[in-house]
Amino acid sequence: MDIRYDCRQFKGTMPCQPHKVHGVECNLKCKYYVPTDGNILIIKLGAMGDVIRTTPLLIRMKKEFPNKRIYWLTDFPAVLPDLVDFPLTFSVEHLTYLRSLKFDMGINLDKESEACALLEQLDIKKKFGFGLHQGMPAPISESANHKFLTGISDTYSKANTHHYMKEIFDICDWEYNGEEYVLPSKKHNARIDSLDDSKPIIGLNTGCGVRWPSRQWPFGHWQEIANMLLTSGLHVLLLGGSE
């Protein structure tokens, strides 16, 4: 059997979707073959909101490199969309796997030392974002200087007029053209699906990332707004957990 290891749908540990749905075998005759020609790595561990805010990069990546496999290392793989071929976590198993690969492009948007060290260590042709200098987090590309300075200088940060999307696109040497967030595919929930869809459903995300506890809204405020929405005849849905 001529295995198409470079097919985007090839899993290696289980049958691919075309095999399950159409019964085709993985060989040179498969009409569902989707070729790939390289790999891209994104390192954006957290916080959850920042991971979601980084997803517009995927739109540009798919436009510039439609045949690349995209790997994303994060603490929140559940929020990654289907455009990511391999959602990975910062675990021994996944780090071991990453070290066996070669990447055409690697982007690290975190300044934590472990993320910076990993970008330095991996086999990546073109690196963007943050690495290490004398053992400390530092811009690994000139395009990351601006974002780096906003993190070490309050003066520079207060004078900064760039929004997050422009900053991360600048790091990759791309112009931000209004690319939007990309969310995971909808997953059906019987309790939510049973709600009266003639009324709007208002989601309240009551959690808060551990990095920014000052942004946590007081519990009483959540009660007040939930009661106000319910009184107005709207559905209220509490989202997430502690974060």
Protein language model regions, located:
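Catalytic machinery of carbohydrate-active enzymes
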Residues: 1-243
